[in-house]
Amino acid sequence: MRYYGSDVVLADVPDEISLTFSIVGCRLNCSACFWQELRSAPTYELDDELFTDTIQRYRGLVSCVLFYGGEWHPLELIRKLKLAHQLGFKTCLYTGLSRVKDSILKHLDYLKTGTYQEKLGGLSSPTTNQKFINVNSGEDLTAQFWQLAPAKRK
């Protein structure tokens, strides 16, 4: 599994500080998706040792490990989701698909689904087609992102 890089984000999973991993290989080609900018960026191998070392460095600073993609590498993704849970982190997957395999879903705490459609907007738009779910409770948390939308100028 290859990735573009990792980062710490505050707003991509409600009530969590997340360490993100942007995984190489999405083939959905959603119009205006931020992934388009990443296609020419350098990539790195995300083996289990590097993954474990990286998330352990952030222990106590982040509460969730978030994968932007990776469902196209199900066995590797599942292995990393299990490692994250074993180390006490919650897990999240952002996918452009409408659903993911049950074998992946059972290792997630949160899941964002749906392609990015520019005319509908992303999660911060009330008209979005995307959904953000707490997998454990089944609660749809999408509306929590709407308060993050920039105010419209009059």
Range-by-range predicted roles:
Residues D102-K154:
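Classical nucleotidyltransferase
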Residues L38, G70, T115-Y116:
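Flexible loop residues that form catalytic
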Residues L19, V65, T91-L93:
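Hydrophobic faces of well-ordered beta-strands that scaffold small-molecule active sites
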Residues M1-S22, W35-S40, K154:
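N-terminal [4Fe-4S]-dependent radical SAM core
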Residues S18, S63, D109:
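Conserved acidic residues
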